[in-house]
């Protein structure tokens, strides 16, 4: 398991609410919680930025983190991430914030301490552009959206 530096920014984290943890041995994501001052009602179409009370420092440029939605919130309640995926670069050290968007038709209450997203570490490969006049041919070529076939 990889060590990840973290700072607790809200004293309720680790006392009133557990630190982010994997739910099962096979879980890929650490659950992030809404460290709000009070329950927040998210109206249909509304987006709100939710603090997690936590900052991390990955440090290794070969890694990044992504903040992803929790599947149940999106499927059952229409609550998804306002930016769809949050990318945390290895050199970022600020608080992890979660943009929550209510794409549903009814108001939804985000409770203080509720699990609202998950954090997943991913490998990163940095590249540089090699400018060429032409590409080696491939079977697909420049075929775009829908080019590889339907269902």
Curated annotation (Swiss-Prot):
Task: Kindly report, in one word, the top-level EC class recorded for this enzyme.
Answer: hydrolase
Q: Give the binding site residues for substrate.
A: 70-72, 83, 87-89, 97
Xref: Pfam families: dUTPase
For this protein, what reaction is catalysed? dUTP + H2O = dUMP + diphosphate + H(+)
Residues passing through the membrane, by range: none
Hydrolase found in the keyword field:
yes
User: Could you tell me the EC number(s) of this protein?
Assistant: 3.6.1.23
List, separated by semicolons, the cofactors it needs.
Mg(2+)
Q: In which pathway does it act?
A: Pyrimidine metabolism; dUMP biosynthesis; dUMP from dCTP (dUTP route): step 2/2
Quote one Gene Ontology molecular function term: magnesium ion binding
**What superkingdom heads the lineage?**
Bacteria
Q: Which GO terms describe its biological process?
A: dUMP biosynthetic process; dUTP catabolic process
Q: Which CDD domains match?
A: trimeric_dUTPase
Enumerate the SUPFAM superfamilies for this protein: dUTPase-like
Tell me which UniProt keywords the record has, alphabetically.
Hydrolase, Magnesium, Metal-binding, Nucleotide metabolism
Name the job this protein performs: This enzyme is involved in nucleotide metabolism: it produces dUMP, the immediate precursor of thymidine nucleotides and it decreases the intracellular concentration of dUTP so that uracil cannot be incorporated into DNA.
Family, according to the entry, reads as follows:
Belongs to the dUTPase family.
The identity of this protein, by name, is Deoxyuridine 5'-triphosphate nucleotidohydrolase
Originating organism: Pseudomonas putida (strain ATCC 47054 / DSM 6125 / CFBP 8728 / NCIMB 11950 / KT2440)
């Amino acid at each position: 398991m990889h060590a990840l530096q973290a700072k607790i920014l809200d004293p309720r984290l680790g006392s009133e609410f557990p630190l982010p943890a994997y739910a099962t041995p096979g879980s890929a994501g650490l659950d992030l919680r809404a460290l709000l001052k009070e329950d927040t009602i998210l109206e249909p179409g509304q987006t709100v930025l939710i603090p997690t009370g936590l900052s991390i420092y990955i440090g290794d440029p070969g890694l990044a983190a992504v903040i992803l939605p929790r599947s149940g919130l999106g499927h059952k309640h229409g609550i998804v991430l306002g930016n769809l995926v949050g990318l945390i670069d290895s050199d970022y050290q600020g608080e992890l914030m979660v943009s929550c968007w209510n794409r549903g038709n009814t108001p939804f209450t985000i409770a203080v301490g509720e699990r609202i997203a998950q954090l997943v570490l991913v490998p990163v490969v940095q590249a540089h552009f090699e400018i060429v006049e032409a590409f080696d041919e491939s079977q697909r070529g420049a075929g775009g959206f829908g080019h590889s076939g339907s269902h």
